[in-house]
């Protein structure tokens, strides 16, 4: 089942979704909540992602019935919410997420951006798990208010920027103080919150570990070519320099120490006030 509002821009194509599912075998796209003694393995990552999902579900207020998952990814959260008796709907402007959701979850899907959505309303809870950062800040609470029942809830679990002068790390995520200011000026109040930055840290550590191994592997694989064809290697480097430099500049995004110094990953549950 599908519903949609007009999409003025080309539908997004989430290549990360395809990579995580098809290449890595991951059913979830979000960070994980790790235990202190967890090793950096694929199985531990999957368990951490499931723990994150369970944390969200356990945090749902009593009396909640109808739930909208904004940026529903692979549909795993909706699938488990439905199994627990909730009436769920998904929302995303991404064509791949739409396809995966249709294959996995028998529920209504809204093929649109949240800020452009024409929702009928009546939701008890809206969940934004790592999707709030993609929604214009001035639209987050405005559209949520229109879509929720009186005294409905907005659950945000995402990372925010603490330092706007931190280069690449400052480019993704809402400014933390601006987000809280926007919330304070809205019709919502915070009813619970938790800083989970320490819990998600190992997600970055395992990503950085994989990146190092990939770079080392690429170096080893090209070693003989570089030795035997130095001139051709210079040409290859020249053509691929911009992509290589971009990859290096973006590697900082998975540096756990720098991430935790510049960003804050927080769970915040808001309630709409009369």
Where are each of the predicted segments found?
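N-terminal, positively charged/glycine-rich alpha-helical extensions of SAM-dependent methyltransferases
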Residues: 1-36
């Amino acid at each position: 089942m599908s519903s949609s509002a007009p999409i003025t821009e080309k539908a997004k194509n989430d290549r990360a979704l395809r990579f995580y599912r098809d290449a890595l075998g991951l059913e979830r796209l979000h960070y994980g909540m790790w235990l202190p003694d967890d090793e950096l393995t694929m199985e531990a990552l999957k368990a951490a992602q499931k723990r994150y999902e369970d944390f969200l579900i356990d945090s749902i207020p009593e009396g909640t019935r109808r739930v909208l998952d904004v940026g529903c990814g692979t549909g795993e959260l909706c699938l488990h919410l439905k199994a627990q008796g909730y009436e769920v709907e998904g929302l995303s402007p991404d064509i791949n997420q739409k396809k995966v959701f249709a294959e996995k979850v028998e529920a209504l899907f809204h093929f649109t951006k949240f800020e452009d959505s024409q929702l009928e309303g009546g939701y008890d809870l809206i969940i934004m798990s790592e999707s709030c950062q993609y929604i214009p800040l001035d639209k987050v609470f405005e559209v949520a208010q229109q879509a929720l029942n009186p005294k409905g809830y907005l659950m945000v679990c995402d990372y925010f920027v603490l330092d706007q002068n931190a280069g690449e790390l400052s480019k993704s995520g809402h400014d933390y103080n601006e987000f809280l200011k926007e919330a304070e000026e809205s019709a919502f109040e915070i009813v619970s919150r938790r800083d989970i930055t320490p819990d998600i840290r190992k997600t970055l550590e395992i990503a950085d570990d994989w990146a190092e191994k990939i770079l080392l592997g690429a170096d080893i694989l090209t070693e003989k070519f570089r030795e035997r064809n130095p001139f051709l290697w210079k040409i290859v480097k020249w053509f691929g320099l911009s992509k290589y430099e971009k990859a290096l500049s973006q590697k900082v995004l998975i540096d756990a120490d720098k991430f935790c110094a510049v960003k804050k990953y927080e769970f915040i549950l808001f309630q709409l006030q009369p």
